[in-house]
């Protein structure tokens, strides 16, 4: 759930709506909050209002240092961090900073979410674009932090991606939404989600 006091993306929810959603799910459900904010004071204020189990940091990775991530964890004991790791399309691994980021952030991250980063965007993910899965595999093999793969995944390709990378988990945003929704918003298509889960479990 993406939420915050300052509206940063079209689909971001208000603090009030995020709180309603978190309070409405089953007790055993893991509540994940997402932010692209790069100011830990802004993030802190949001977390004081609505505290998830896991915070997905999906903004410009260089906008929040590992030391600042550690400070967030110190302020909210028990909060787990899922750090997005950006992967560029059509760029060889040796020309990317993904492995460097992994080494920098693994001491303060509970999970990595490996996702496609568009050339024109500061934040990571929500592109619907895939990338070279051998890069995912290299990242996964380089760290003990559980890695979730993302980027252009749907029911048609997720099993192959799992077979190629053996990740901790998989994530889909763009390609499991309805095809036609109001501009700037997204809405999950239950049939696409069901197919995605079934394909994932079959891998």
What is the predicted role of each segment?
Residues 1-8, 56-64, 116-121, 164-193:
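Glycine-rich phosphate-binding active-site loops on the catalytic face of alpha/beta enzymes
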Residues 2-7, 24-29, 41-47, 54-142:
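Conserved anion-binding
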Residues 7-21:
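Conserved Radical SAM active-site core
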Residues 11-14, 129-132, 186-189:
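Short, conserved glycine- and acidic-residue-centered signature motifs
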Residues 17, 22, 67-72, 173-203:
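C-terminal helical cap(s) of enzyme catalytic domains, especially alpha/beta-barrels
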Residues 31, 81, 147, 167:
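Hydrophobic anchor at the start of a short beta-strand
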Residues 34-40, 85-91, 149-156:
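Glycine-rich beta-to-alpha transition loops that act as phosphate-gripper elements at the mouths
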Residues 148-163, 177-180:
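A C-terminal functional module that forms or caps the active site or interfaces directly
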